[in-house]
Curated annotation (Swiss-Prot):
Entry function: Involved in the biosynthesis of the iron-molybdenum cofactor (FeMo-co or M-cluster) found in the dinitrogenase enzyme of the nitrogenase complex in nitrogen-fixing microorganisms. NifB catalyzes the crucial step of radical SAM-dependent carbide insertion that occurs concomitant with the insertion of a 9th sulfur and the rearrangement/coupling of two [4Fe-4S] clusters into a [8Fe-9S-C] cluster, the precursor to the M-cluster.
Broad EC category: lyase
Key words, A-Z: 4Fe-4S, Iron, Iron-sulfur, Lyase, Metal-binding, Nitrogen fixation, S-adenosyl-L-methionine
Free-text comment on the cofactor: Binds 3 [4Fe-4S] clusters per monomer. One cluster is coordinated with 3 cysteines and an exchangeable S-adenosyl-L-methionine. The two others probably act as substrate.
Species lineage: Bacteria, Pseudomonadati, Pseudomonadota, Gammaproteobacteria, Enterobacterales
Binding site for S-adenosyl-L-methionine: 60, 108
PROSITE patterns: MOAA_NIFB_PQQE, RADICAL_SAM
InterPro entries: Aldolase_TIM, MoaA_NifB_PqqE_Fe-S-bd_CS, rSAM
Cofactor(s) this protein cannot do without: [4Fe-4S] cluster
A Gene Ontology BP annotation from the UniProt entry: nitrogen fixation
Coiled-coil regions listed in the entry: none
Family: Belongs to the radical SAM superfamily. NifB family.
Protein name: FeMo cofactor biosynthesis protein NifB
Domain Radical SAM core stretches: 40-137
Length: 137
């Protein structure tokens, strides 16, 4: 059984009973702001718009949507190259020491943009090895 809680831009779901998780997974979830019950108050996260392509073309998905009041994974005003993305991450990490997770969630499907996605993750891993990497497809 899972429990979902609403947040700006969607829902976060996790097992209703954390004892169902292995100790390794429970430790990782506790330090990840998307899955930890209290983590989103202590850790900062950043999503990088490096993946424009999507092979699904779902009717409900409008990846061209761009609104200054809309801030969630998959909505972006600009597209970054992998090199631009790692520069941006370094700038944010310097300004916000709580940054602990960097994710790629669009604006398309990261796995439909495998070269850009993996190059971005590779550069971040090389230059900022303490950050957790997240991929949402």
């Amino acid at each position: 059984m899972t429990s979902c809680s609403s947040f700006s831009g969607g829902k976060a779901c996790r097992p209703a009973d954390d004892s169902a998780l292995t100790p390794l997974v429970a430790d990782k979830a506790a330090a990840h702001p998307c899955y930890s019950r209290n983590g989103h108050h202590r850790f900062a996260r950043m999503h990088l718009p490096v993946a424009p392509a999507c092979n699904l073309q779902c009717n409900y998905c409008n990846r061209k949507f761009d609104c200054s009041n809309e801030s969630r994974p998959g909505v972006s005003s600009t597209l970054l190259t992998p090199e631009q993305a790692v520069v941006k991450v370094r700038q944010v990490a310097q300004a916000i020491p709580q940054l602990s997770v960097v994710g790629i969630a669009g604006p398309g499907d990261p796995l439909a943009n495998i070269a850009r996605t993996f190059r971005t993750l590779e550069l971040i891993r090389e230059q900022l090895p303490d950050l957790k990497l997240c991929l949402s497809t």
